[in-house]
Amino acid sequence: MPEAQVVVNIGPGKDITLSTGKICKLANGSCVTRMGDTTVLSAACSGAAKPGQDFFPLQVDYREKYSAAGRFPGGYIKREGRPSDKEILICRMADRPIRPLFPEGFFDEVQVCGLLLAADGINDGDVLSMLGASCALCLSDLPFQGPIGALRVGMINGEYIANPTNEEMEKSSIELVYAGLPDKVIMIEGEAKECSEAELEGAMRFANEIVKKMCAAQVELMEKAGRPKKDPELHIVPEDMAAALKSVTGEKLENACLIPGKEARMKALDEIQAEAVEALKAEYEEKYGEEDFMFFLKMGFDKLVQKIIRTAILEKGYRPDGRGVTDLRPLTADVNVLPVVHGSGLFRRGETQALVIATLGGPQDAQETDLITGGVATKKFYLHYNFPNYSVGEVGRIAGPGRREIGHGNLAERSVKQVIPADFPYTIRCVSEIMSSNGSTSMASVCGATLALMDAGVPIKSPVVGISCGLVTDDTGKELILTDIIGAEDHYGDMDFKVCGTLDGITGFQLDLKLPGISIDTLARAMAQNKEARAKIHGVVRDCIPAPRPELSPRAPQMEVVKINPDKIGALIGTGGKNIKEITESTGAQVDIADDGSVSILAQNKAVLEEVKRKVQFYTAEAEIGKIYRGVVKTVRDFGAFVEILPGQDGLLHISEMANYRVQQVSDICKEGDYLTVKVIDIEKGSGKIRLSRKAALDELDK
């Protein structure tokens, strides 16, 4: 592979360099993508299809190593381990736009690996990895029908920005990750601060113009250094067997495909498939062999079901569960469904049901992530999504969260976090437990999280709800957008477009396609249809709980932030942490101290909170002129004694101020460790030195 490179300008002072041929020469295709000093290697390799495999085993991987930023991994083990959530999310984001661009029936193993080689802390490597994955596949001999372009779009003061820096993203009201062909969109994902549909559409059209440049640059690089494409081996059901399968299933299969209930429909389809196996086994098992016979039959049966469902939708507007094109499934919403917990919400849409639990905590419960590409990120709100086997009535391996669960939780989290006030002091964790599933569980999680937060008394700005729209097309260009898709429509349809938002705007979105791209116009129509559906769901949520509860759940911990003089932080902590340890151990409260003097207190109840506040005030109190204190003698000198009147605050009690008579020796009045009643008679400006008088204190107390 000869060395070659191209440069794409995506905005003022923003160039992306794509190069190949210098490193990673044994891969089918490789590319080094660079923007600023952030550099990502992408490599594509392939292997033969496994016997009996009836799907495309594309694997996309992305890793960020600390060495890319000139750092060591933290902790005892100085080596990176399992992928982080961020890396997993980038893998999913890179997978979705390239998967539809391989030919149907191509089942070879394909692996695309992204590796962050250098991180400048300004530009993130995620969209560079997506672009590099496309370029590596284009340069390879694999039957990839690209190239695609990929970039992030932000919006600051109404102006769109391509691949904004980390600093620019903090000011942006939209974060759109866009991937597509020169004339079509394939994947979008992101979040927004209640943006309008028009603003999101504008961001997509802005991104599409840059994608055209990216695709042209990759074509140029392919001409310089690309490998010739090989003819792929496609696994397609033989025509004779496909015709025989259609004949034996006939009208019975058509009727079964349109049974409204998921469980009843799946049972009927399984029975018909079993009958087809028995009917065709004798003839075709001998012809193709036992393994290939079952392979072709399952694939052919699935194709028949797909065609029946799609034809019914397109030609008759008839969906598998009997709804109209824009109809929603039956909706219900409940709150306060569990005891003990801080907040809970149960949201049901048809056969999909999500139970979400909200838990409130303090600053110590926030999640800190050391981002290699740009500092430490602290999350005060996080949402975890769990999809157990019983939610689909199946038995399976029980393990930790997979990529899908991490991805669904992230979408719901990004969508809901937009309405949580920035000054809300609590850390919040929402856990979505999917009770049953027939499509759009992530959107049910968004609705359930809104219910749980409002039940817990979290003062969210506005309820957030979500809904998914699907798409069915044919070869003539006819297309139909479906509102609130079920599992079968997701599986056999062309699109899963999730949009979340309040009544004022969009907060989160994600597009998955099986087609090699659709027009932005089609996506804009889907957004309009989605908006109408969200308004109906908002009505259901508000009927259940019109607004957040006026007070936090009585089961939630009490939290308050008090301000102290930053100079008193040392006094509050104490020598070796003595004071702060005494506070936390005696009360069981969490106390977090910020550099600006903000002290966050998290206590189990109001009484404990007040006790902690009293202790904080005691350790951080300022000496006042004219006030009498009971202090302990810390040091004795010939000229007087130093008395600690407040934690960390000593004052000089001069020998002349010890009594109403002449004191010959300090030891006649006190020794170290004695307690004395003294009055502050002066505090020196600038130095803050305190002068004390026992004589004045005794005179005042005798009055």
Please name every model-derived segment.
Residues 29-31, 123-141, 335-358, 438-458, ...:
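Conserved phosphate/anionic-ligand binding catalytic regions in large, soluble enzymes, centered on
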Residues 555-559, 566-703:
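Single-stranded RNA-binding regions, centering on S1/OB-family and related RNA-binding modules
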Residues 1-7, 11-14, 28, 39, ...:
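Alpha/propeptide regions of enzymes that mature by internal proteolysis
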Residues 96-104, 139, 362-365, 388-393, ...:
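Conserved helix-loop functional segments at active or binding sites
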Residues 1-46, 233-376, 557-571, 579, ...:
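Extended amphipathic alpha-helical scaffolds
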Residues 27-111, 116-123, 182, 189, ...:
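Glycine-rich, flexible beta-strand/loop modules in the N-terminal catalytic cores of phosphate-handling
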Residues 141-260, 453-550:
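Mobile "lid/hinge" segments at catalytic clefts and subdomain interfaces of large enzymes
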Residues 104-110, 145-147, 214-232, 263-264, ...:
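Flexible, glycine/charged-enriched surface loops at secondary-structure junctions
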